[in-house]
């Protein structure tokens, strides 16, 4: 075997239901190339970088001639805002970015205006040092800019009024400590109703005592200005949606009886004076929503709302998520203290992720009436435009739960987990983006993620491991996944200008690794930063063996895999010398890694040349990088599937296990590899977890990969050429006998109906969009496909 070592001389490169998800209106081009007439404004005499919640108001007159057909405004804030017109909430934002790309929303407020006097109001908050890690910030600020001269009357300046809220204080500051987990989504909200300026967003409110806003500076768009505090860019994703979501069931109460009609909003619940009660609500599936609680009376009462993915037993185990006996809630929470008046609505500043919500209520001398409680479900407006079914109905539940997981992990960026972090990691985002492409056909969040990571690059050339983020974290392996993500986009979308802009950054990323190649062994030497691979089986940080000491086969082979993808990109964009260099380097890395790490005795690829540890991960990358032949890859795959003594992949890396199965022409085994998802369903999970039990997060979209693989692996629908210009259909049915699938591609929809014909044959009914061709392949036989409907029997 060791004669496979190839010595290569490499050449050097020379070269509410508020429908907030409509299409975004156009921006006046002048505002994208010069300073805005409006000002960034703030509240005077306040610490601008500390925690604070602010109310901004502006009254303005419309002429009696009638309402305008359009009234476009551009809005942004630091940290965030919620915008009201004449008392109605119409928008929130901005989409998260960084100071170099601070996003603004463009909103047509004409439908909400009336002749005569109108009120434009905004709730703006800055979490200061308590902000989520995903929140970048400069200081508290707010801006509104009219799109044209007709809308300039609402521009932010000293004519706006502002009041700092005394009602808000942060709470739930010890979430991470109580949950014994990394949790960085920001604090909960404690709101004192007697200090809240109720109806402040309406025209009738008297703001005579409010301060005039303080002008900071004129906003500047990307590419312009000097001394910029924020550099503004148009929002590049749709506005997030909101829709009402009611609780279906009360699971437990303490010291009170609750009629089921309370949950429908038809029957208020009265909590007597001087009582302590608790009510456990079960959404019956994970959700991301703004809980809204409407109360009357109960002056001085204390209402604590605790949110959790699951309940915990005394050993802090979750167990079956449907079971609540001998378990208690533990998690993020908010507190509301009513002022005693009627129909007071509490809503937290930011959404909460939960399955269970517990109300712990303490009343004083005044009875408290709970008029209603529900959630306003929110998230990116992903729409299901694909379908999958088979003769195994259990796969439908996996498909359904995977889609739900993907939805909850999509907001103004991809979230790793909506409960614990709400951070966009490259390793997660690659899988999430493919799910989005295959199930919805929507590529906008994928494009934003690629750009976000592009903007995160460090002077060394690596992308940050998660971004946007106010804390530096670099995961070199995730920088490689960023390159893979661009390659994915290139294969699935025809957008040369978008892809081409990243080539210099791709080169810099890959050169960071090239500069760290051990010149003796021709494998990667010692690597800095956090070289995360997978959570289990390595160490507490999921770091690959050999990453810090040098000669990690896993990362070396992933680097080779990425070099081959980059070579395809550079060759496609007329950089043949660079492509040749990348291919030769990949070949050299593969050959030397195989030489040093292949163990003839057990037929496995070791994690390092010392051959002390072995993992599925090393074998996976050996197959994907081309370090082994097809026959060798099949032998290797059988060993890593059957040898339970070696490091096993978790849910994240099962995506790559499946990719390796397909490359080894063993995709039919995928169906048997679905047991981990079946096990999660048996545990009562309504979304897919971060890793096998015990898991921190119950909702992690890197574990939703079956929603991609049911279409790309079982149905076998893949791009045949870049841009999905042609289609390759290569089914891997496994033990299934019938499969139906439909998915969107740029040209339209691809549909397949597949039925086994005897033991080895297949009958395929395939529908391709107009002007689309492809190839159908089954057990080594190929049939050319044309546009329209065709029936194939093999």
Regions found by a protein language model. Name each.
Residues 180, 188-191, 421, 439, ...:
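C-terminal capping/lid segments that line or modulate ligand- or cofactor-binding pockets
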Residues 47-48, 72, 95-98, 108, ...:
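Alpha-helix capping and helix-loop boundary segments enriched in small/acidic/polar residues
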Residues 1-26:
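Bacterial Sec-dependent N-terminal signal peptides
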Residues 290-309, 357-362, 426-456, 486-493, ...:
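Alpha-helical support elements that line or immediately flank enzyme active sites
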Residues 155-171, 356, 364-401, 407, ...:
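Active-site acid/base region of carbohydrate-active enzymes
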Residues 172-199, 256, 315, 584, ...:
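Non-catalytic C-terminal accessory modules of carbohydrate-active enzymes
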Residues 23-419, 428, 444-445, 449, ...:
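Extracellular/oxidizing-compartment recognition motifs
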